[in-house]
Design a protein with these regions (language model features):
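Extended soluble regions of mature proteins
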Residues: 20-99, 103-221
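Bacterial Sec-dependent N-terminal signal peptides
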Residues: 1-22
């Protein structure tokens, strides 16, 4: 459960995709685990994730192990986000503000080394450029993230927590590491489609709580 909480925390910063030219639509991501991933763990992890965006709002959704559904809804206008967790029928909503960054994460990102390369490749039909973000965690261990982003969709990851805050444009491929587990998300397709406003509404059957409350409840730290 602690691993699940950590992954959820890391995914919060991926959730806000703000479209200008492409006013609304859906992105489908393929998820691959690193070659050193435990086979049993790998069998329980999701194979894809989805993101919907419309007028400054976004919804990032994936189904975790044991059927747990994790959804993050973000609103650029109010600078807020809410994580919806459905754990086998137990439903919780964890709200936060963009400015409420974890102090340790903020310090690491402020001191991060950002290398914007000239490497490019096409992802889901869009030209993407590679950015390398290197930083040290509280133990002093170095971590490196390769993020491929495009400006063709005029999305913005600025203001988010984590490595995404260092990238211009929309991230269409990125990796996330948590302990021995590495997940790489790559956009398979960007679909231009109408998105219902209900995608960005928190259902009434979710109980609101803080991330600290959730960690205490699940025995996490």
């Amino acid at each position: 459960m602690k691993t699940i909480i950590s992954i959820i925390s890391l995914f919060i910063f991926t959730s806000t995709l703000l479209a200008q030219p492409l006013a609304e639509g859906r992105i489908v991501y393929d998820i691959k685990l690193g070659k050193d991933a435990d086979p049993q763990m790998a069998s329980m992890m999701p194979k894809e994730a989805f993101s919907w965006f419309k007028k400054g709002k976004s919804r990032f959704e994936m189904t975790m192990m044991m059927g747990m559904k994790n959804t993050t809804i973000s609103d650029e206008a109010t600078k807020t986000s809410v994580v919806l967790m459905d754990m086998m029928g137990m439903k919780y909503a964890i709200k936060s503000k963009f400015e409420d960054s974890n102090p340790e994460t903020k310090k690491a990102m402020d001191e991060a080394k950002v290398t914007k390369t000239n490497e490019t490749k096409i992802i889901a039909g869009y030209n993407c450029t590679k950015t390398i973000v290197e930083f040290k965690d509280k133990s002093g261990k170095s971590s490196k993230f390769d993020i491929w982003s495009t400006k063709d969709l005029a999305f913005s990851s600025k203001g988010q927590e984590g490595p995404m805050s260092k990238v211009d444009g929309a991230a269409l491929e990125f990796s996330i590491a948590q302990g021995p587990l590495t997940m790489t998300l790559t956009a398979r397709e960007v679909v231009r489609e109408a998105v219902s406003d209900t995608k960005f509404i928190v259902p009434s059957d979710y109980k609101e709580m803080s991330m600290d409350d959730l960690k205490k409840m699940t025995g996490g730290r």
